[in-house]
Amino acid sequence: MSDPRERIPPGNSGEETIGEAFDWLDRTVEEINRAAVNHLPRELIFQVWRRSWEYWHDEMGMSVSYTKYRYLCLIQKAMFMHCKKGCRCLGGEHGAGGWRPGPPPPPPPGLA
């Protein structure tokens, strides 16, 4: 008889699909963007998004999902550092920040 402590927890059966992982990644990117806009300048978020695509996707030839994952890691790190330094935002938006000349970069998911 097997030990009941050895059972696989619900939701971790290995039956999840790659499609579900991609859906999770898309949802998570949108959610962190909605949260990040309350703590980080929009220009920073947009530039990290744009540079992630330029570097990881265009220059390095990585997949769309890998590019989104790398962007997610960078924004999570930025949010962590912001909160670690003592967030005093209280839910207020920072606004656009210092926009560079020319049209703004395309917004990341969740900020369109």
From Swiss-Prot:
Swiss-Prot/TrEMBL GO biological process terms: symbiont-mediated suppression of host innate immune response; viral life cycle
Gene3D superfamilies in alphabetical order: 1.20.5.4730
Residue stretches in coiled coil: none
Pfam families membership: VPR
Binding residues annotated for Zn(2+), in chain numbering: 39, 82, 87, 89
Intervals of motif Nuclear localization signal: 65-72
Keyword Zinc: yes
A GO CC term assigned to this protein in UniProt: virion component
Keywords of this entry: Host nucleus, Host-virus interaction, Inhibition of host innate immune response by virus, Metal-binding, Viral immunoevasion, Virion, Zinc
Localization terms from the record: Virion; Host nucleus
Similarity-based family: Belongs to the lentivirus VPX protein family.
UniProt function note: Plays a role in nuclear translocation of the viral pre-integration complex (PIC), thus is required for the virus to infect non-dividing cells. Targets specific host proteins for degradation by the 26S proteasome. Acts by associating with the cellular CUL4A-DDB1 E3 ligase complex through direct interaction with host VPRPB/DCAF-1. This change in the E3 ligase substrate specificity results in the degradation of host SAMHD1. In turn, SAMHD1 depletion allows viral replication in host myeloid cells by preventing SAMHD1-mediated hydrolysis of intracellular dNTPs necessary for reverse transcription.
Name the UniProt record assigns to this protein: Protein Vpx
Gene: vpx
